[in-house]
């Protein structure tokens, strides 16, 4: 056993040689790239639901139950008194929640308007606890906004800050009688636009990370007033006395049945969001697993390049009488230093990447949930990235241990040359792994993570054979150049002494491009499917009229159907149909209910029906009591076509299943019925949108202008053509896929950095060999061109192999996304993505390594043959 001082002495002695120090730094860089990629991708997959969980926790506080209205019209607030009168209930507090937009001088923002009872300030969660009774009295006719939202709409800082109001309460109240102290803004709820004031902004000191949530707060009475919901609430939160839970739950269940409400735990929104975000989390998790594999292999391949140098260190220690234990100690200390440095650097780089890349929120879920933009970094995420980095360092450093166990030591080419049995094993293993991947693709695509692992294993096992084929092709091609530089490059590529390092470089390129092509290609297929969905759902009519704002892209905000009467008499319109829709909680899912007019051209687009006869399903939907349901929902309810089920709408109604569909781009799923059946089940004739078909010969612009004039300048309704609405859908879906896009981008960036680092390390190791070759009189320019040719062949070989397997990975991931998430994909092969990835990674890495290549050929010639 060696002491720590002796180990440090050996380590410092090794680092005195500049070549060794540079190799160690490049190995640190290679592992750091892998750690950064793994950390940033894991942050992406864990951040999505953090804001909703935090908001739910801070809002409900110690409440145990909630009575939740099933429709946007809410329920009479009389239910609050009935709930409070139940034996065992300590408190029953009303809450009014509505989709809204706040409009300021610089723009608008979508928010979840929360009208809270003043008593929430004392017994609710931290979100409302910083308001005391005096503050709530002061802001009876105002709203509160998180500071980032107020700044975004140009409302600026209020004249009275929430953090200072507590100290100035009575003075501010007195001064408010003498003149206005708040900033005027506008609030749009449905088609209704009202003027209000920004009474306070919520700072991070008040509500912590929730300052990034899309919420607006107001007293419940004021929220009822501005929202046209006088006497109505959407939720009732209940606090139970100790030991009375069973009694209270039974009483609340009877009350819920009477009023047609949902009885759920107080924090049930977090459960609903978990179900809503599961498909996105699954797809992001799948992509993150691929990224993790890619990142780990980046790190491992970076360490492979240092194996020859460590083999020489082992040989030197053995000659000086070092025991096996001493050698292992030195190697493990080396691995620990590299691993720790790489993990620290990787976490720092990953933190920067995740901050810069993951700053936007997935807007498609913010239509039904107050999703924030904050990042959530957990200890398991850090531990996973650090563990993978340390593992790569230890495996890479300890790889030479096989030489320690050999007696005698094997040197040079003998150590580099693989036995014939190992070659046959690689060929058989690659073929078997490829067969397993194919079976997973055909029979079990939801096991795509396993399939991706076996596909990468097949690629790495078969890579030496494919690499030899590409080098043989280069050999035939270079004969036409008659250039010394290509001859030198070919000799290096075929040299058995450098084969392991050459294969490590090619493998790094293959892994890099594989990850980029597979992830980007699958994401492109998903985006194409969502684009088709946007076209099919929106091009059923000429014009759409609905409450303005991106938050109403799915047309789920109600407004009076009487608006249609204003438009039916316009000369340029052929028909005006009432479209209805909203979100409805079905079990643990917040599903999207779509209810087009019965006479709509297409009640269910052909591309959305996955099981069933299109003609029969359309005919049934035009009748009474039929519905098309997403496959995931139908499987949960154990439904088959033709069977009946009760829809838990405000007025529970029986429907029969006409067919099964995709999720329509809404992760929890969709239910399609006609607008008349919707009005019956919801007990409301309110519209969510108007479908307008123009008369023959009327241009879109002319018809749109007529409708806008008829609605009037103060209307909160927007008039869009089918094309404009389609573009809005596509924009929102791209935002929803931003995490996947960011993960794909990170993989590509990491690929370039990893390839550049590995190539630079390889070139630096060649300095002694270049110095020995220069004795033959070769010029710097010739040697630099030879290095560039060699690097180009290595890069193109590895990247081309990765692109080939990446296209297969794209098909595997695409089928997995369809099966697991229910998204409407357009599955195809994207050769352009593969070619682009090969070109970007190869050109960028080659441009980067050109500099160290030029520096390497400046070494002085020597007669000493390298070891």
Each predicted region: which residue ranges?
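Hydrophobic alpha-helical transmembrane segments of multi-pass inner-membrane transport and secretion
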Residues: 20-46, 278-315, 336-350, 388-395, ...
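Alpha-helical transmembrane segments, especially those used as permease/efflux helices
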Residues: 1-30, 249-257, 279-282, 286, ...
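Membrane transport/envelope proteins' first extracytoplasmic loop
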Residues: 2-296, 305-308, 363-364, 534-539, ...
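Alpha-helical transmembrane segments
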Residues: 14, 21-23, 33-62, 77, ...
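Juxtamembrane segments of multi-pass membrane proteins
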Residues: 61-74, 453, 459-616, 631, ...
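Small-residue-rich transmembrane alpha-helices
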Residues: 300-303, 337-368, 380-406, 432-444, ...
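Short beta-strand boundary microenvironments
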Residues: 111-171, 532, 539, 552, ...
């Amino acid at each position: 056993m060696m002491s720590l001082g002796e180990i440090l002495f050996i380590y410092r002695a090794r680092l005195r040689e500049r070549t060794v120090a540079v190799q160690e730094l490049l190995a640190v860089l290679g592992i750091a790239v892998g750690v950064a990629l793994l950390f940033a991708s894991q942050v992406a997959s864990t951040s999505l639901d953090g804001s909703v969980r935090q908001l739910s926790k801070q809002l409900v506080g110690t409440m145990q139950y909630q009575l939740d209205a099933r429709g946007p019209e809410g329920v009479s607030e009389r239910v609050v008194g009935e709930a409070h009168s139940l034996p065992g209930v300590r408190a029953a507090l009303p809450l009014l929640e509505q989709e809204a937009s706040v409009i300021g001088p610089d723009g608008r923002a979508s928010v979840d308007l929360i009208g809270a009872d003043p008593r929430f300030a004392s017994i609710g969660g931290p979100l409302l606890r910083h308001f005391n009774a005096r503050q709530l009295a002061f802001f009876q006719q105002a709203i509160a906004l998180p500071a980032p939202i107020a700044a975004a709409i140009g409302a600026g800082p209020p004249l009275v800050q929430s953090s200072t109001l507590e100290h100035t309460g009575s003075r501010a109240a007195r001064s408010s009688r003498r003149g206005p102290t708040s900033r005027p803004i506008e609030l749009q709820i449905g088609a209704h636009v009202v003027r209000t004031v920004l009474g306070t902004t919520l700072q991070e000191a008040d509500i912590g990370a929730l300052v990034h949530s899309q919420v607006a707060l107001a007293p419940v009475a004021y929220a009822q007033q501005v929202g046209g919901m006088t006497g109505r609430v959407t939720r009732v939160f209940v606090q139970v006395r100790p030991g009375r839970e069973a009694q209270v739950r039974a009483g609340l269940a009877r009350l819920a049945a009477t009023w047609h409400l949902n009885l759920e735990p107080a924090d049930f929104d977090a459960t609903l969001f978990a179900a809503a975000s599961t498909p996105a989390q699954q797809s992001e998790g799948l992509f993150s697993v691929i990224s993790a594999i890619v990142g780990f292999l980046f790190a491992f391949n970076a360490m492979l390049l240092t194996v020859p140098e460590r083999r020489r260190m082992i040989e030197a220690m053995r000659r000086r009488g070092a025991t096996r234990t001493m050698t292992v100690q030195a190697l493990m200390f080396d691995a620990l230093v590299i691993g720790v440095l790489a993990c620290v650097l990787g976490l720092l780089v990953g933190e920067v990447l995740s901050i810069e890349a993951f700053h936007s929120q997935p807007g498609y879920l913010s239509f039904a949930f107050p999703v924030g933009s904050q990042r959530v970094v957990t200890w398991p995420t850090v531990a996973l990235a650090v563990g993978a980095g340390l593992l790569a360092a230890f495996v890479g450093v300890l790889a030479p241990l096989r030489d320690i166990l050999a007696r005698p030591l094997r040197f040079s080419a003998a150590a580099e040359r693989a036995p014939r049995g190992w070659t046959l094993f690689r060929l058989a293993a690659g073929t078997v792994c490829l067969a397993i991947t194919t079976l997973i693709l055909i029979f079990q695509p939801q096991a795509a993570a396993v399939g991706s692992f076996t596909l990468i294993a097949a690629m790495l096992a078969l890579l030496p054979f494919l690499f030899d084929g590409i080098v043989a092709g280069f050999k035939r091609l270079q004969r036409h150049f008659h250039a010394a530089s290509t001859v030198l490059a070919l000799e290096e590529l075929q040299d058995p002494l450098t084969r392991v390092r050459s294969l490590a470089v090619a493998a790094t390129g293959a892994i890099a491009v594989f990850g980029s092509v597979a992830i980007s290609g699958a994401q492109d297929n998903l985006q194409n499917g969502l684009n088709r969905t946007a076209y099919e759902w929106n091009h059923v009519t000429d014009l759409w009229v609905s409450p303005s704002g991106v938050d109403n892209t799915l047309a789920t905000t109600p407004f009076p159907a009487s608006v249609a009467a204003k438009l039916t008499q316009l000369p340029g319109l052929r028909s005006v149909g009432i479209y209805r829709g909203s979100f409805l909680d079905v079990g643990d899912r917040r599903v999207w209910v779509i209810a087009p007019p019965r006479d709509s051209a297409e009640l269910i687009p052909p591309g959305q029906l996955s099981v069933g006869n299109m003609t029969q399903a359309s005919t049934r939907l035009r009748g009474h009591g039929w519905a098309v349901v997403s496959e995931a929902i139908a499987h949960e309810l154990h439904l088959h076509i033709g069977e009946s089920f009760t829809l838990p709408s405000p007025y529970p109604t029986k429907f029969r299943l006409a067919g099964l569909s995709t999720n329509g781009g809404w992760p929890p799923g969709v239910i399609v019925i006609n607008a008349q059946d919707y009005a019956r089940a919801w007990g409301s004739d309110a519209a969510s949108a108007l479908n307008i078909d123009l008369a023959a010969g009327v241009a879109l612009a002319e018809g749109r202008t007529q409708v806008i004039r008829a609605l009037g300048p103060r209307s909160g309704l927007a008039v869009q053509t089918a094309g404009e609405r389609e573009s809005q859908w596509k924009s929102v879906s791209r935002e929803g896929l931003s995490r996947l896009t960011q993960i794909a981008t990170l993989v590509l960036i990491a690929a370039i950095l990893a390839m550049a680092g590995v190539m630079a390390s390889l070139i630096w190791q060649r300095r002694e060999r270049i110095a020995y070759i220069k004795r033959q009189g070769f010029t710097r320019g010739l040697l630099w061109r030879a290095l560039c040719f060699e690097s180009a062949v290595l890069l193109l070989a590895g990247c081309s192999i990765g692109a080939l397997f990446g296209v297969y990975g794209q098909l595997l991931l695409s089928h997995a996304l369809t099966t697991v998430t229910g998204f409407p994909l357009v599955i195809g092969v994207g050769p352009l993505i593969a070619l682009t990835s090969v070109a970007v990674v190869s050109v960028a890495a080659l441009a980067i390594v050109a500099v160290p290549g030029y520096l390497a050929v400046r070494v002085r010639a020597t007669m000493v043959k390298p070891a």
